[in-house]
A protein has these predicted regions:
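Conserved short histidine dyad/triad with adjacent acidic residue
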Residues: 26, 40-56, 90
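A short, N-terminal "cap"/entry segment at the start of jelly-roll beta-barrel domains
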Residues: 1-37
Length: 115
């Protein structure tokens, strides 16, 4: 019997997101790569952290687990707090930040269009 892939997230290190982000870190939610056009990560925005506005060719779903922040989608400010789910369609300008004094923890789903 094949063993299921298991990832112990509390033991995995946080990786800086990179690029123009500031104070944003992530951990992959999968132990293996999925060829299906989908990935997910646990994302941490430290106090003052920011993912600058940008446009992607894929859809995001952000689900807030803990903390408070704010997203910007096509110029509209959207408050983020625990329990919020926000979908940003491909091609829409978006970004988010954590202006609060506490960590903002979210699940980020990236859904790529299949050819």
């Amino acid at each position: 019997m094949e063993k299921p892939d298991r990832l112990q997230l509390n033991e995995a290190p946080w990786a800086p997101f990179g690029g123009k982000t500031r104070g944003i870190f992530r951990k992959s939610l999968f132990a293996v790569a999925f060829p299906s056009g989908f990935n997910a990560s646990l994302t941490l925005a430290k106090p003052g952290g920011e993912f600058p506005e940008h446009v992607d060719s894929y859809t995001h779903v952000f689900y807030i687990l803990e903390g408070e922040g704010e997203a910007f989608v096509e110029g509209q400010r959207i408050p983020l707090n625990s329990g919020t789910a926000l979908t940003v369609l491909a091609g829409k300008r978006h970004g988010y930040r954590n202006p609060s004094p506490k960590d903002l923890l979210l699940i980020t789903l990236n859904i790529y269009e299949r050819p």
